[in-house]
A protein has these predicted regions:
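Alpha-helical/coil-rich non-catalytic "connector" segments in signaling and regulatory proteins
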Residues: 1-110
């Protein structure tokens, strides 16, 4: 198996231009759109942080953290600590739509 140089990975902005992301909105952290995406991780498990790898784009509905305000506040800092390229949250069912402004503010800081 060969390893791919990170410069070969698409940027988050390029990934978000794919048809599957049509209609998605960047709510915060726009300064990070140049980060390289090495893979995608779809998870809603309570121990999601165990399964994250640097460079991934995490996509979640927030199911496992919806009833835990501390876990919601910790989602983006945890993602940053793990070196993720970004976090995509599908709001509406488990997390409010629109998402809390606190999440956007945190994304902008990170």
């Amino acid at each position: 198996m060969t390893s791919q140089h990170t410069a070969d990975y698409p940027t988050l902005q390029e990934v978000l231009r794919l048809p599957v992301f049509a209609g998605c909105t960047v709510c915060g952290g726009a300064a990070g759109l140049g980060r390289r995406v090495s893979g995608v991780n779809l998870t809603d498990t309570p121990d999601y942080a165990r399964w994250l790898a640097q460079g991934e784009l995490l996509i979640t509905t927030g199911f496992s953290i919806a009833d835990d305000p501390q876990a919601i506040r910790g989602l983006l800092p945890t993602a940053a600590e793990q070196g993720l390229s970004g976090v995509g949250i599908k709001p509406g069912r488990y997390l409010p739509n629109p998402l809390p402004t606190e999440l956007a503010e945190t994304a902008d800081r990170l």
